[in-house]
Amino acid sequence: MTKKKRENLGVALEIDGLEEKLSQCRRDLEAVNSRLHSRELSPEARRSLEKEKNSLMNKASNYEKELKFLRQENRKNMLLSVAIFILLTLVYAYWTM
């Protein structure tokens, strides 16, 4: 996802969307694996399914990498929010004493 698009969406919403895409990708991968193992296929059909399987595995891997990055970004944002809250609390406590 491009940086500009990432700025327009909340990180949590992006994570939710990406998790859904990853889930769908895994379901599709299971379906392809099932078709590969359950039927007697022609060599051409088998190659096609193997290609689709590799494509889905690459897509799932990319989604997992992106999720890892987004979760790290989300963690940094949360820590920054907590730090700002603590700082404001300390300033308020100092000011009111």
UniProtKB/Swiss-Prot annotation:
It is a single-pass membrane protein. It comes from Homo sapiens (Human). GO terms for cellular component: membrane. Keywords: Coiled coil, Membrane, Transmembrane, Transmembrane helix. Pfam families: CCDC-167. It comes from the Eukaryota. The gene is CCDC167. It is found in: Membrane. The chain crosses the membrane at residues 78-95. Its main location: membrane. The lineage of its organism: Eukaryota, Metazoa, Chordata, Craniata, Vertebrata. This is Coiled-coil domain-containing protein 167. Residues 10-79 form a coiled coil.
